[in-house]
Amino acid sequence: MMINARLDKAQTSTWKALFRSGRCIVPADGWYEWVAERGRKQPYYIQPNDAAPLFFAGLSSVADDHAAEPPAGTVDGFVIVTDAAAGGMLDVHDRRPLVLSPQEAQAWLDPATTFDEATHIANNARTRPEDFHWFRVTPQVNRSGAGNDDASFNQPIGDDE
């Protein structure tokens, strides 16, 4: 199962057809990144300074419910488009979500937006580190199973926790 589509591969790979007609937006308040600290992975929550919603560029594939049999390889779902890292906390790893401005998100969703225009939007979207802040959060976000989805997971914790 894939959860992201690399921007540098999205326009020339399996994702190309979805880049043409399967664009979607994944709304978010922020995202997590894990940093190695004291021999363990410490999660950080990254969010915009102005607390405005984020618009992650996404690609979606949804089978046609009216089709007698869905095309081979069709899987319902979506992936987040990721971009190359440029350094700093937003880029702890080599990839990060492709965050679009509200205007870029609107154009991304517009069915009239061509493949070339969508490519231009994706290649020119920029996430500026100074527009975000980040803080340590509880390692409980790493746990799977029941009870792993709680608003407190997005609250800052102290350095000694």
What are these regions (language model features)?
Residues 1-161:
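A structured binding-face within diverse protein domains that lines the active/interaction site
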